[in-house]
Amino acid sequence: MGRTLAVPTPYGCIGCKLPQPDYPPALIVFMFCAMVITIVVDLIGNSMVILAVSKNKKLRNSGNVFVVSLSVADMLVAIYPYPLMLHAMAIGGWDLSKLQCQMVGFITGLSVVGSIFNIMAIAINRYCYICHSLQYERIFSVRNTCIYLAVTWIMTVLAVLPNMYIGTIEYDPRTYTCIFNYVNNPAFAVTIVCIHFVLPLLIVGFCYVKIWTKVLAARDPAGQNPDNQLAEVRNFLTMFVIFLLFAVCWCPINALTVLVAVNPKEMAGKIPNWVYLAAYFIAYFNSCLNAVIYGVLNENFRREYWTIFHAMRHPVLFLSGLLTDVREMQEAQAHTHARARARTQAHEQDHAHACPAVEEIPMSVRNVPLPGHGAAGQPECVSGHPKPASGHSRSVSARRKSASAHPKSASGQSKSATVYPKPTSVHFKPSSVYFKADSVYFKPSSSHPKPITGPSKTAISPATSFPKPTTGYTQHATIHSEPTTLDYLEPITTSHSKPVIASHSELAASCHLECNIFDLSDPTSSPASDSSNSAASLLDPTAAAAATVNPTVVTTDYHEIVLIDVDADSDEMAV
């Protein structure tokens, strides 16, 4: 592995090999020991912070997520850059590759910028917790906290990456480490200091001033417990001291960077080398102080520290405790997921009860237009009858017993009696379908309706229940309809009056009546004759009532009415 080449500059010797540094040997030994202690305390202390937060349920909150993130940022420099610094101090120079020097500078930048950004996130979290307590749970929910943490580290990486291209990372013999050389680009150096140090400090200072003002305004010495006041003050002081120590430790090195960047020719030779060394080592020492501050000022952290110390004396118990904690965390997560699933199912059931599912319409009654819908584009009456002036008609019912579930048509083929009940019945409009009281009558001996031939109205005999043709005369004494169940009664018409079918479409009468009507047209009569005969019957109802029924008239035109009595307990049939 070759040595790094020397790069002399007018403002100092950066990258030069110094076999005999101008520091006293005692100072080098002291700094070497201080760095060893810093590395040990950094690794152990920040590891204990992470374990304490993971083991203590009281410490598992959104604010301590950024505390753990700050501990990770502090541990970065103790893992890689600090050991290489010890190596450079031991041999008096840098004998490693250029890539390793670049890695040292990049990881150091991540640690420093990550620390200040996490301290800023902690201050914002404390500010929202104290000054905006009502919105705290919504702002710092578990999901939002993870997003904020990811944004913090993304900002850290984006803030350090420009230094890899603009600022040159080189070995500095004054600090025994690889740093960013901003001497050749003073404007960039000032910008970096403002973004990485000054702006975060202003934000953190604003948050803690607001917090302190809120705490002082909320104090009530007469009605508040002094122990609670002391606990609030200690919780506030813990994070404030963390911020204050970071500002004190990193202020000297940032001030030197700005001074050298503003006036490099004059300031480069006036600043002694030991000032650079002291400034950098104070900044490096800050990485191990946070864990100590937590243990001194926070009772929960201090209690967990003692628990970890006692557990480390018995490694087997310590490992078993860790496994138990991991298992408890998994069980807690499984319980949380189960509760979430149960809550989701409860919401779905409530929604299902609130919005019941609509039953599917059976195939036998699908595509059947409801009354009033199919007549939108066609005339309502095809027989020439005037539209009744009354409102919705009620269904006319006749008492009959069902002897067969499958009535047969004239061709001998049985009709399907399968009926799919629906939660609600269909109510017909008076303009859709209505049968006249004098056109249908029944005989109680049989329940098998048969098609009726003839150009006149359909009549069902009470003796046989077989439809018989009528020749324009209705037998008034055989009418079994109940006029009290109708909203209106039409006069008795002549032989050419027909049931009114809206729009020539099929008719489905709820789930108790299925009517298949064929051959609506009458080849033996014309609409003109229908209209005239209907008018005559309307003018002379007594003549039609006195007429006799001629059962011998046979015609080729018929209307088929299939009656299905589904409900055995019902004594009525809707007409």
Swiss-Prot record:
UniProt keyword list: Cell membrane, Disulfide bond, G-protein coupled receptor, Membrane, Receptor, Transducer, Transmembrane, Transmembrane helix
Annotated disulfide bonds: C101-C178
A Pfam family of this chain: 7tm_1
One CC-aspect GO term: plasma membrane
Extracellular-facing ranges: 1-30, 86-103, 165-188, 261-273
UniProt feature, compositional bias: Polar residues: 455-474
Cytoplasmic side: 52-64, 125-143, 210-239, 295-575
Example GO molecular function: melatonin receptor activity
Topology in membrane: Multi-pass membrane protein
PROSITE patterns linked to this entry: G_PROTEIN_RECEP_F1_1, G_PROTEIN_RECEP_F1_2
Region (Disordered): 368-421, 446-474
Subcellular localization(s) per the UniProt record: Cell membrane
Subunit and partners: Homodimer, and heterodimer with MTNR1A and MTNR1B. Interacts with KAT5. Interacts with RTN4 isoform A/NOGO-A. Interacts with TGFBR1.
Role: G protein-coupled receptor that plays a role in numerous physiological processes including regulation of energy metabolism, neurite outgrowth or cell migration. Promotes self-renewal and neuronal differentiation of neural progenitor cells through activation of the NOTCH and WNT/beta-catenin signaling pathways. Modulates the KAT5-dependent glucocorticoid receptor signaling by modulating KAT5 subcellular compartmentalisation.
Family indicated by similarity: Belongs to the G-protein coupled receptor 1 family.
UniProt name for this protein: Melatonin-related receptor
